[in-house]
UniProtKB/Swiss-Prot annotation:
Effect of a null allele: Not essential for growth on low light, loss of circadian cycle and rhythmicity. Cells elongate.
Extra information: 'Kai' means 'cycle' in Japanese.
Induction (free text): Transcribed in a circadian rhythm with maximal expression at 12 hours and minimal expression 12 hours later; expressed as a kaiB-kaiC opperon. Down-regulated by KaiC.
GO biological process terms on file: circadian rhythm; entrainment of circadian clock; negative regulation of phosphorylation; regulation of circadian rhythm
Phylogenetic lineage: Bacteria, Bacillati, Cyanobacteriota, Cyanophyceae, Synechococcales
Species per Swiss-Prot/TrEMBL record: Synechococcus elongatus (strain ATCC 33912 / PCC 7942 / FACHB-805)
Top-rank taxon, per record: Bacteria
Function in brief: Key component of the KaiABC oscillator complex, which constitutes the main circadian regulator in cyanobacteria. Complex composition changes during the circadian cycle to control KaiC phosphorylation. KaiA stimulates KaiC autophosphorylation, while KaiB sequesters KaiA, leading to KaiC autodephosphorylation. KaiA binding to the KaiC CII domain yields KaiA(2-4):KaiC(6) complexes which stimulate KaiC autophosphorylation. Phospho-Ser-431 KaiC accumulation triggers binding of KaiB to form the KaiB(6):KaiC(6) complex, leading to changes in the output regulators CikA and SasA. Circadian oscillations can be generated in vitro by incubating KaiA, KaiB and KaiC with 1 mM ATP. The cycle is self-sustainable for at least 3 cycles and resistant to temperature changes. A very robust clock is reconstituted with KaiA, KaiB, KaiC, SasA, CikA and RpaA; output is measured by transcription from an appropriate reporter.
Gene responsible for this protein: kaiB
Protein name: Circadian clock oscillator protein KaiB
Length: 102
């Protein structure tokens, strides 16, 4: 069995809006179910830290970025569809590969 990777994620939000709160809640649920402690999530409020959004070229919120493992992947907007989030971040393939016990 190969060692599990640690996933480094950044969630960019704009304040404490309903969309931001929903995105964070949904994402935490996905991460706890799918990655059980092998992730680090940094939430960045672009209203409080606009320089970080500018450095990372964030144009819309919410934006979720998978920084590590490479390649970097981003999802912009609605994070409510678990499968789309996992596919968009290139995480579902590994999950499927690990469960090939047919």
């Amino acid at each position: 069995m190969s060692p599990r990777k640690t996933y480094i994620l950044k969630l960019y939000v704009a304040g404490n809006t309903p969309n931001s709160v929903r995105a964070l809640k949904t994402l935490k649920n996905i991460l706890e179910v799918e990655f059980q402690g092998v992730y680090a999530l940094k939430v960045i409020d672009v209203l409080k830290n606009p320089q970080l959004a500018e450095e990372d070229k964030i144009l819309a919120t919410p934006t979720l970025a998978k920084v590590l493992p490479l390649p970097v992947r981003r999802i912009i907007g609605d994070l409510s569809d678990r499968e789309k989030v996992l596919i968009g971040l290139d995480l579902l393939y590994g999950e499927l590969q690990d469960s090939d016990d047919f």
